[in-house]
């Protein structure tokens, strides 16, 4: 626990000081914690990747104190706690001003995320950095950038069953430090009491056997004939030498009465992934389980994980191994993967120290719950004078969701795709108070706006692509998420299923 003496010492040097309380219990889960605090909770970040430090933790953000949102090509820093707003011309300036205003003492804890901005940057934000035409306006406006800086961060350690409550207390001249510390301790005690005394678990039950379905019942923004024709157009661009590859996508839609958190609870069970997230912004909810890192910046070290090449998981170890061998012998998949590794090297190379860029792992098989992929890891060391945000922008968006060469591919996609991509192909990320960044590519993700659910999926088109196969690939990818929607509706619309 943070003592008053420790708080007083830090309050003399910082504008925002973490007040921390930790306790152990084997009675709580992250889902219970979020449910108990659902009125204040705005995000949950999790991971199920054994090699990652993230897999030991779940992070829940409560009660935003500052948000950054893009509106009309301007960036609004909205200080929700102080009640004032600033307008700035760039995202980088908005973030740096926010860090300066908060001036946070970084918690001295061995956890991968120590507080900061959590949110998304949409694919369409690329028009702020590259000569890619802006996407047309849509009826439902979704900001290209939205970050939340929460007043309280809950950290759940899956291994030790320890829970940390980190409350970021802002020091000001209107109240004395004793009052600020006392109010912080009261807030922490209130949160702990609610966590430990919420005994209504009836809404948290899930069946042990999930009823699967093979139907596909989603509306698309693309007529099939146009999609097939656009695949041919991309192949013509490739033949003409404009590009090597482009990722053509279609967006699917359906209505649902289920909440985003209900969808997330089912998704985390049926499709555990390295990056799992539930984000809540006013009318928008984001639910996802992405397998692919966009960029990590950790103490000046850069890392990207290009993923390309997919096979289903085998029913037995023998079948699984056979499918993995087939994948590594597929010339089309290997060629695409090598191209994306080169893109990652170029992205990191623009912001890395000379000679520091290296491929630390090359074409290894990564196995997930339903599929396997070919994965590589590209690393580098951040160049002096280059900020972590500069590094992120250099890698954005991922080549795996755009194409190569990246800018020309995005220009062609903007010409062909009928609507804005919004979050699809962009990034879910945190920008830490400590300057670190971790981010994933926004794929295998659902967005929910006023009961309208959107799923988007793409296929990488190359010179020898078969249009029908590429179309079916997008259907297959979207079907995996539609299964989650169907299961969620089945479970929560018919609570009798819980008696199975």
Where are these regions (language model features)?
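Extended alpha-helical targeting/anchoring segments
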Residues: 1-500
């Amino acid at each position: 626990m943070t003592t008053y003496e420790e708080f007083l010492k830090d309050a003399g040097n910082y504008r925002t000081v973490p007040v921390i309380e930790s306790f152990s219990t084997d009675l709580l889960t992250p889902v219970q914690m979020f449910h108990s605090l659902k009125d204040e909770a705005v995000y949950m970040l999790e991971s199920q990747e054994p090699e990652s430090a993230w897999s030991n933790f779940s992070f829940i953000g409560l009660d935003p104190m500052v948000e950054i949102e893009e509106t009309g090509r301007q960036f609004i820093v909205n200080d929700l706690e102080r009640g004032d707003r600033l307008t700035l011309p760039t995202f980088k300036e908005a973030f740096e001003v926010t860090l300066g205003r908060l001036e946070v003492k970084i918690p001295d804890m061995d956890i991968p995320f120590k507080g900061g901005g959590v949110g998304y940057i949409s694919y369409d934000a690329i028009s702020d950095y590259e000569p890619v035409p802006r996407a047309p306006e849509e009826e439902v406006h979704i900001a290209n950038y939205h970050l939340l800086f929460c007043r309280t961060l809950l950290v759940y350690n899956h291994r030790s069953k320890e829970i940390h409550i980190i409350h970021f207390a802002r020091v000001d001249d209107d109240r004395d430090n004793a009052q600020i510390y006392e109010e912080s301790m009261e807030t922490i005690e209130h949160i702990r009491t609610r966590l430990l005394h919420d005994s209504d678990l009836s809404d948290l039950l899930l069946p042990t056997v999930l009823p699967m379905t093979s139907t596909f019942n989603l509306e698309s923004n693309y007529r099939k004939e146009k999609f097939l024709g656009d695949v041919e157009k991309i192949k013509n661009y490739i033949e003409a030498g404009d590009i090597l590859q482009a990722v053509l996508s279609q967006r699917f839609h359906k209505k649902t009465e289920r909440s985003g958190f209900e969808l997330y609870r089912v998704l985390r069970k049926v499709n555990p992934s390295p990056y799992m997230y539930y984000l809540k912004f006013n009318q928008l909810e984001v639910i996802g389980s992405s397998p692919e890192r966009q960029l990590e910046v950790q103490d000046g070290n850069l890392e990207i994980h290009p993923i390309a090449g997919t096979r289903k998981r085998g029913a037995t170890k023998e079948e699984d191994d056979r499918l993995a061998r087939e994948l590594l012998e597929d010339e089309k998949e290997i060629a695409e993967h090598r191209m994306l590794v080169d893109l990652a090297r170029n992205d990191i190379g623009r912001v890395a120290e000379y000679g520091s860029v290296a491929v630390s792992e090359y074409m290894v098989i990564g196995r997930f719950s339903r599929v396997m992929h070919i994965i590589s890891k590209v690393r580098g060391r951040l160049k002096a004078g280059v900020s972590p945000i500069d590094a992120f922008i250099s890698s954005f968006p991922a080549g795996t969701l755009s194409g190569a060469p990246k800018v020309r591919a995005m220009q062609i996609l903007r010409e062909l795709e009928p609507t804005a991509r919004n979050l699809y192909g962009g990034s879910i990320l945190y920008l830490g108070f400590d300057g670190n960044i971790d981010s994933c590519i926004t794929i295998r993700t659902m967005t929910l706006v006023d009961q309208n659910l959107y799923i988007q999926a793409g296929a990488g088109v190359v010179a020898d692509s078969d249009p029908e196969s590429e179309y079916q690939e997008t259907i297959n990818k979207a079907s995996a998420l539609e299964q989650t929607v169907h299961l969620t509706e089945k479970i929560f619309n018919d609570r009798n299923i819980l008696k199975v």
